A protein has these predicted regions:
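Glycine-rich phosphate-binding loops of nucleotide-dependent enzymes
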Residues: 1-145
Length: 145
């Protein structure tokens, strides 16, 4: 399989169950080990060995299963939002919860996320609002892919 995505394009993978959509996305994100092939971003070949390396390279993944792979349901919306963005909100091991909440508020407005407060448990949100929180945390990262 080969494909190219240009800056600003929205790219989706479609297919029947078992066709390899999820596996392909997980390979690109570094969640599964790649046996062959290459991933190139901005002309540079990436050798991703983990999701952490993928995130650092500007790659994110909106999972199919937000409940088990996209959110920590027992944690607050703010905490879920902050997880992939700790490098932006933490300093010397302390999280600046005010900055984290302010950044979240921007996305809550833009995506029209319905919640009572940033400290509301992610598990109590509707499915659509949970998915918006997953999207918000990656939008905050300004991911490339």
């Amino acid at each position: 399989m080969s494909f190219s995505v240009r800056r600003g394009e929205i790219f989706g993978i479609a297919g029947l169950v078992g066709a390899g959509r999820t596996e392909t996305a997980r390979l690109i994100f570094g969640a599964d080990r790649r046996e062959a092939g290459i991933i190139t971003l901005d002309g540079k070949t990436l050798r991703l060995r983990s999701t952490r390396e993928a995130v650092a390279a500007g790659i994110c993944l909106l999972t199919e299963d937000r409940k088990t792979q996209g959110l920590v349901l027992g944690q607050s919306v703010r905490e879920n939002f902050g997880l992939p963005n700790l490098d932006s909100f933490a300093w010397l091991g302390f999280i600046d919860q005010k900055r984290e909440a302010e950044a979240l508020e921007v996305h809550v407005g833009k995506l029209q996320i319905k919640l009572s407060s940033a400290d509301q448990s992610a598990g109590t949100l509707s499915g659509g609002n949970q998915q918006k929180v997953v999207l918000a945390k990656w939008l905050e990262r300004n991911a490339e892919v």
